A protein has these predicted regions:
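Non-catalytic DNA-recognition/assembly elements of restriction-modification systems
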Residues: 51, 207-251
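Polybasic, glycine- and aromatic-enriched phosphate-binding surface used to engage nucleic acids
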Residues: 1-214
């Protein structure tokens, strides 16, 4: 970016991204990865973000040269870019020759009403990414639900949930009680859990007040897992024997 004003404007588009492997209990270990998030609903004018535009366009020449198509990069780069961004879904041909990147024939992106720099499909819930949320790995042998409030996005190896009392829900899902509630989730052939949104939705979670959620938020901020687990057991009104069984088998 050439100016601080442009840098501040551009920062809206560049969002931290989390992979499934980054998700930890109650948090995450960010790998310093970013994603350019240009949601169609935001109606961005890419010319107001010249650094982002130059970065996106640079991949065309880079991909051509790395795949041995130097002649296209040297002589027909503009034609190649126009075809690539035409949103026709057609194969790209230069001087009657189909262009390949590796073993894959290059095609224009599919027909869509969105602009070339935007995601191909509209995302109606794009604003939810900016809200405090829970992220978790979709497939895994260990249950971990991370809490995020800095607007990070998640790869498709993750699921996320947002809404009211999200800190409380994060506590329930990470607790032994939460692991017990998810014990019958579908599994892969190798025994890994398939924790889709559909697997989480049916679990029974007691309703709480805003004040109680604030208590869970405090415990979450102070990493007080023992107090979270105790409070969750209290809300489910379990007997001592039931608590012992769950603690011994679902930590």
């Amino acid at each position: 970016c050439e100016t601080e004003e442009e840098r501040a404007r551009t920062s809206e588009l560049i969002r931290p991204i989390l992979r499934g492997r980054d998700i930890k209990r109650y948090g995450y270990e960010w790998a310093n990865l970013y994603l350019i998030a240009t949601f169609p609903a935001c109606r961005y004018d890419i010319d107001n973000y010249p650094a982002v535009k130059d970065y996106l366009v640079s991949f065309a020449e880079q991909n051509l040269r790395e795949s041995g198509n130097n002649w296209v990069a040297d002589l027909y780069l503009e034609d190649y870019c126009k075809q690539k961004l035409a949103q026709t879904g057609k194969f790209i041909e230069i001087k009657g020759k189909r262009i390949y990147i590796g073993n894959t024939a290059e095609k224009a992106r599919k027909k869509t009403s969105n602009k070339w720099f935007e995601t191909q499909d509209s995302i109606s819930y794009w604003e939810d990414f900016s809200k405090p949320k829970i992220l978790w790995k979709r497939v895994g042998s260990i249950l971990r639900f991370g809490y995020n409030k800095n607007g990070a996005l998640g790869l498709d190896s993750t699921c996320f949930a947002t809404g009211n009392n999200i800190e409380y829900l994060c506590g329930v899902l990470n607790s032994p009680m939460g692991h017990y509630l998810l014990k019958d989730s579908p599994k892969t052939g190798t025994g890994d859990l398939l924790i889709s949104v559909q697997a989480v939705e049916p679990i029974k979670v007691p309703q709480i007040s805003q004040a109680e959620n604030d208590t869970f938020k405090y415990y979450l901020d102070t990493n007080d897992e023992e107090e979270i687990n105790r409070k969750v057991f209290e809300l489910y009104d379990l007997s001592n024997d039931e608590k012992t069984y769950i603690n011994e088998n679902f930590r």
